[in-house]
Design a protein with these regions (language model features):
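Anionic-ligand anchoring segments at beta-strand to alpha-helix junctions in alpha/beta enzyme folds, i.e.
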Residues: 1-22, 261
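Short, basic, glycine/proline-bearing loop/turn elements
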Residues: 2, 26-33
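Short, well-ordered beta-strand core segments
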Residues: 26, 55, 72-74
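Glycine/threonine-rich flexible loop motifs
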Residues: 32-43
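A short helix->loop->beta-strand "cap" motif at the edges of active sites that frequently abuts
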Residues: 47-54
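Short, polar loop motifs at secondary-structure junctions
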Residues: 58-64
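Long, well-ordered, tryptophan-enriched scaffold segments
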Residues: 66-67, 71-217
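A glycine-rich, hydrophobic/aromatic-adjacent loop/helix-cap motif
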Residues: 175, 181, 197-276
């Protein structure tokens, strides 16, 4: 199942869960937690809805969860990836909003990608990014907390006569084909509805907001998704859940209050840590 693969790769956990205590906008796809979840889960959902969390349910049928949500959006079965790809297109190329500090500091978005689709590397095998101040490709130094501020998130550059783009630029360019109009022909969800959900996703994410918990300040990104068997049990679930995590990544809603967390069943750490 795609969820378990991404749970391990992104969260070090077997499953992924929304932080219902602080989440203000929840997208539920392929799951019916209000009747198929456990007692504790139902209690958390009830409390979240009672305090004002907005819940949008994308499901082919009007489930009990859809009936309790703020909006039910019927979708053609197995087309959730098209819906989320269109949301990404709207956010990146129509609205033009994202959490730049998170993307620069926590993801490979500034890494340079060559014509062959692989990250560019120097003679020592280190991944390269573009330094905006020196205007040249430099090795990524994860030990330097100041470096991300200097790196280009978007752009096309030349390194040793090789044309390259940042990883985030390639994502932004790639999703241009996934317009809401295209997604409407696939999912049967109106293009305007997709745009409205994408706009809400950005607005509720509160990019730049923080929250203090137990004397420590954390980023606050109160938007999340909840996926279920209706997503993971169909063809291409890996790509669907990749699109889901990209949605969270764009706004920095990963492992922060209000956002997308690893579940209570922990794995053995990040998979790269297991490689000798």
């Amino acid at each position: 199942q795609g969820e378990h693969m991404f749970g391990n790769m992104w969260h070090g956990a077997f499953t992924c869960e929304p932080d219902l205590k602080y989440c203000n906008y929840l997208l539920v796809l392929g799951r019916n937690p209000m009747s198929s979840g456990g007692v504790a889960e139902n209690y958390q959902y009830a409390n979240a809805l009672a305090r004002g969390m907005k819940m949008i349910v994308v499901d082919p049928r009007l489930s009990p969860t859809g009936a309790k949500g703020n909006q039910w959006i019927p979708i053609k079965p197995g087309t959730d990836s098209a819906f989320m790809l269109a949301m990404i297109q709207v956010i990146l190329n129509e609205i033009g909003a994202w959490d730049e500090p998170f993307l620069l500091e926590k993801t490979n978005s500034p890494y340079l990608v060559g014509p062959d689709g692989y990250f560019l590397r120097d003679e020592d095998g280190k991944v390269l990014a573009w330094d905006k101040l020196s205007k040249q490709a430099v090795p990524v130094d994860n030990s330097n907390p100041e470096q991300p501020k200097r790196l280009a998130l978007l752009g096309e550059f030349t390194y040793k006569k090789t044309s390259c783009k940042t990883s985030f630029q390639m994502l932004k360019d790639h999703v241009k084909q996934y317009t809401p109009e295209w997604a409407e022909s696939v999912t049967e969800i109106k293009a305007n509805t997709i745009r409205e959900v994408a706009k809400d996703w950005i607005e509720y994410a509160q990019i730049g907001a923080t929250i203090e918990l137990d004397g420590q300040v954390f980023p606050l990104r109160p938007v999340a998704t909840k996926l279920g068997r209706g997503i993971t049990g169909v063809m291409r679930s890996y790509q669907t859940i990749l699109a889901n995590h990209i949605l969270a990544m764009i706004v920095g809603s990963i492992e922060v209050p209000g956002g997308h967390w690893g579940g209570i069943i922990e794995s053995r750490g990040h998979f790269r840590g297991l490689i000798p």
